[in-house]
From Swiss-Prot:
Disulfide bonds: none annotated. One of its GO terms (molecular function) is sulfate adenylyltransferase (ATP) activity. It catalyses: sulfate + ATP + H(+) = adenosine 5'-phosphosulfate + diphosphate. This is Sulfate adenylyltransferase subunit 2. One of its GO terms (biological process) is sulfate assimilation. InterPro entries: PAPS_reduct_dom (IPR002500), Rossmann-like_a/b/a_fold (IPR014729), SO4_adenylTrfase_ssu (IPR011784), Sulfate_adenylyltrnsfr_sub2 (IPR050128). The keyword DNA-binding does not apply.
Length: 308
C-alpha cells in the first residue's frame, strides 16, 4: 500500500478500485452495458459509474432483464430514476417465456429462473451484441461467487468455466476476447454487505423502500415469508395459505422475483438501524433467495449455464 492509499478509508479504497474497473472496461471494450437489477448493489454500482464519468453520463446503456414478477416498488424506482437521470435504459422480457406461461409457481423456481432470467439475459446480450456486462455481484454473497474473478469470461454460449479463469495480478486485467466471446464484470467483488450499506448511508443513495422494515402482508411458504405484492399470487395459494396471510413487520435483505424472495422480521426502519443489524447478523443475505436452494451447488450450475 502506498502513502496515498494509506490516507484513504476502506470505503474510499473500495470506491477507487471500483471506479478504476468501470473506467478500464469502458476504455477496453467496444460495446459494454451495465445490468441494473434495481437492488442495493446495483444502486451502488450505478452511483460509482456516475462518479467515474462525472460531469458526463456513463458511456454505456443500462439494461434490466424483467421477469414480470419483480416487486412493484422496484419497477417504480427503476422508471423514476431513468426519467430523472435521462438514462439510456433497455428493458428486456423473454417473450417466449411469457407466451409459454412460465411463472414461479407452475414452472418452479429453477425453470422460471432459467427461462426468464438466464435465457432472457442471453437473448438481450446477443440482440444488442454487448461484449462486456457489468453486474453488482459480490464475493461475500455466495460460495460460487467467492471464486469468480472481477473479469469473468464467457464463451460464445455465455457459459462460465470456473476451471478456466485468468489470473488477475494487482489491478491488471486481461480483457482480450475472441469474436463472440464476452465478459461479465464485477466492480463490487471486494465489497461486503456491510460496506454496501455504509456507502449507501454516506453517499445518500436512493434505494427501494422494501429494504426498510414496515408492516407488510406475508404468507409462509417453504419456510420463507413471502410478501403478497399483487393479486396474481393469490390463485396459486392453497386455502390454508390464504387463511394464514398476516401482517408482519418485515424487510428484505435481497430483492428478486417476489414469489422467490423471503422477507425477514426486523425493526430496522432506517439506514443506521440496518447497519447495526448487519453488525450483529450471522446469516447470508442469499438465504432469502429460493433459487439458491434448488440443489447443491445450484448457483454455480446456473452461472455455468449463463446466469449472471
Amino acid at each position: 500500500m502506498d502513502i496515498d492509499q494509506a490516507r484513504l478509508t476502506h470505503l474510499q479504497q473500495l470506491e477507487a478500485e471500483s471506479i478504476h474497473i468501470i473506467r478500464e472496461v469502458a476504455a477496453e471494450f467496444e460495446n459494454p452495458v451495465m445490468l441494473y437489477s434495481i437492488g442495493k448493489d446495483s444502486a451502488v454500482m450505478l452511483h460509482l459509474a456516475k462518479k467515474a464519468f462525472y460531469p458526463g453520463k456513463p458511456p454505456f446503456p443500462l439494461m434490466h432483464v424483467d421477469t414480470t414478477w419483480k416487486f412493484r416498488d422496484m419497477i417504480a424506482l427503476r422508471d423514476k430514476q431513468a426519467k430523472e437521470n435521462g438514462w439510456d435504459l433497455i428493458v428486456h422480457v423473454n417473450q417466449d417465456g411469457v407466451e409459454a406461461g412460465i411463472n414461479p409457481f407452475t414452472a418452479g423456481s429453477a425453470k422460471h429462473t432459467d427461462v426468464m432470467k438466464t435465457e432472457g439475459l442471453k437473448q438481450a446480450l446477443n440482440r444488442h451484441k454487448f461484449d462486456a456486462a457489468f453486474g453488482g455481484a459480490r464475493r461475500d454473497e455466495e460460495k460460487s461467487r467467492a471464486k469468480e474473478r472481477v473479469y469473468s469470461f464467457r464463451d460464445k454460449n455465455h457459459r462460465w468455466d470456473p476451471k478456466n479463469q485468468r489470473p488477475e495480478l494487482w489491478n491488471i486485467y486481461n480483457g482480450r476476447i475472441d469474436k463472440g466471446e464476452s465478459i461479465r464484470v464485477f466492480p463490487l467483488s471486494n465489497w461486503t454487505e456491510l460496506d454496501i450499506w455504509q456507502y449507501i448511508y454516506l453517499e445518500n443513495i436512493e434505494i427501494v423502500p422494501l429494504y426498510f422494515a414496515a408492516e407488510r402482508p406475508v404468507v409462509e411458504r417453504d419456510g420463507m415469508l413471502i410478501m403478497i405484492d399483487d393479486e396474481r399470487i393469490l390463485e396459486y395459494l392453497t386455502p390454508e395459505e390464504k387463511a394464514s396471510i398476516q401482517t408482519r413487520k418485515v424487510r428484505f435483505r435481497t430483492l428478486g422475483c417476489y414469489p422467490l424472495t423471503g422477507a425477514v422480521e426486523s425493526e430496522a426502519a432506517t439506514l443506521p438501524e440496518i447497519i447495526q443489524e448487519m453488525l450483529l447478523t450471522r446469516t447470508s443475505e442469499r438465504q432469502g433467495r429460493l433459487i439458491d436452494h434448488d440443489s447443491a451447488g445450484s448457483m454455480e450450475k446456473k452461472k455455468m449455464e449463463g446466469y449472471f
